[in-house]
Amino acid sequence: MPTGNFGNICAGHIARMMGLPIDRLVCATNENDVLDEFFRSGSYRPRASAETHETSSPSMDISKASNFERFVFDLLGRDGARIRQLFGAELAARGSFTLTGEEFARIAEHGFASGKSSHAERVATIRDTAKRFDLVIDPHTADGLKVGREHRPSGQPLLVLETALPTKFAATIHEALGHEPARPPGLDGIEQLPKRFSVLPADVNAVKRYLQAHV
């Protein structure tokens, strides 16, 4: 699964706990590899904004996944005190925490694997997929496909979550294939349509008043 905020893959984890027959969930990151580092080493080190890379799979340009704590809660036996220690005291004091020993071993026991993909690898995967299957995929899906293939046992089915239309990432598709992707009919001429928006101050009460007046 292409992974940024850990939402889709956390949903897969919950679905598996409910009985969906999934052998492994593969977490694919881009150059912002905080989650890949955790699954490989047990070390969780959220990055500051200045350390977060701008990439060609921008929905995955996240260095502190808001859904991740939910998974670690399950991973550690739903031990609320331990979660408060890790995500409260340790993260606040050191900016990171590390699972070792039995706690780290639980990651593999929970059926998780991970990997990361670079811009060059995204472009190569988009190109290869178009050549082999006559299918154009977006950069995030390319991240998921590249990493998923690395962890796929021979003969086992691989399901890759497609997360966006390639049309939204025309520059990367053009780099990979030499042409922009075809647009769905509903998007033709969208740039020429009227744009409607309101600028609000960074004030929660102003946002509430706006919603009350317009929704």
Predicted stretch roles:
Residues 1-215:
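PLP-dependent amino-acid enzyme catalytic core
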